[in-house]
């Protein structure tokens, strides 16, 4: 985003039910906004899997190190899942925001609401809806084909969708490219908001001297 005024980054939070397009859209956004947007990298205590790189896929730490990060307020939020800790490092997020780089979070509604409660000033939240439950069912069938799995995910999807009203924006994903375009428009608009233009006062002062 070329601009003579410096802007703070945002925390771009994207949620959708399984099959809604969140993962694909997130990958495309990172590719198309690569100078302005980075993927959130979590801290975890689990062992690295083959091919995973520390600092790219996760920040890998020991459990005592993780607990120390929590006790010293260096984690925005965290949880224990299947015996391993996962969390969002505060410094990674705040440093990027201060440098004008936005951070993308592709997370469920529970994680989204935690970030909204903690960092409301910086969060821009978007919920992605499927065009219809029939279309969502078709997408899930193409993934799995197992009726039990599909029915379970459709039930979960209805519950997840019921939380969309708290998001800043809601997009209906008829077409991936159109959805990416809409989110990029939101991204640009949010970055241009007055409260995020950190060099605005200096710019105005120079203009009216």
UniProtKB/Swiss-Prot annotation:
Belongs to the guanylate kinase family. ATP binds at residues 16-23. GO terms for molecular function: ATP binding; guanylate kinase activity. Essential for recycling GMP and indirectly, cGMP. Residues 9-188 form the Guanylate kinase-like domain. Its EC number is 2.7.4.8. It comes from the Bacteria. Disulfide bonds: none annotated. InterPro entries: GK/Ca_channel_bsu, Guanylate_kin-like_dom, Guanylate_kinase, Guanylate_kinase_CS, P-loop_NTPase. This is Guanylate kinase. Its main location: cytoplasm. Signal peptide: none annotated. Keywords: ATP-binding, Cytoplasm, Kinase, Nucleotide-binding, Transferase. Pfam families: Guanylate_kin. It is an enzyme of class 2 (transferase).
């Amino acid at each position: 985003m070329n601009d003579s005024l410096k802007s703070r980054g945002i925390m771009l939070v994207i949620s959708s039910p399984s099959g809604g397009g969140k993962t694909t859209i997130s990958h495309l956004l990172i590719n198309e906004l690569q100078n302005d947007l980075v993927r959130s990298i979590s801290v975890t205590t689990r062992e690295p899997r083959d091919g995973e790189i520390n600092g790219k896929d996760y920040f890998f730490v020991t459990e005592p190190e993780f607990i120390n990060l929590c006790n010293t307020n260096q984690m925005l939020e965290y949880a224990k899942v299947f015996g391993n800790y996962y969390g969002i490092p505060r410094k990674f997020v705040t440093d990027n925001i201060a440098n004008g780089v936005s951070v993308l979070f592709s997370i469920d509604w529970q994680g989204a609401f935690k970030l909204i409660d903690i960092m409301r000033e910086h969060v821009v939240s978007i919920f992605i809806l499927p065009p219809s439950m029939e279309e969502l069912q078709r997408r899930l069938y193409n993934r799995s084909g197992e009726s039990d799995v599909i029915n379970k995910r459709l039930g979960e999807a209805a519950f997840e969708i019921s939380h969309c009203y708290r998001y800043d924006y809601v997009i209906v994903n008829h077409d991936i490219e159109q959805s990416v375009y809409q989110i990029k428009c939101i991204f640009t608009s949010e970055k241009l908001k007055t409260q995020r233009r950190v060099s605005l006062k200096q710019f105005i002062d120079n203009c009216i001297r």
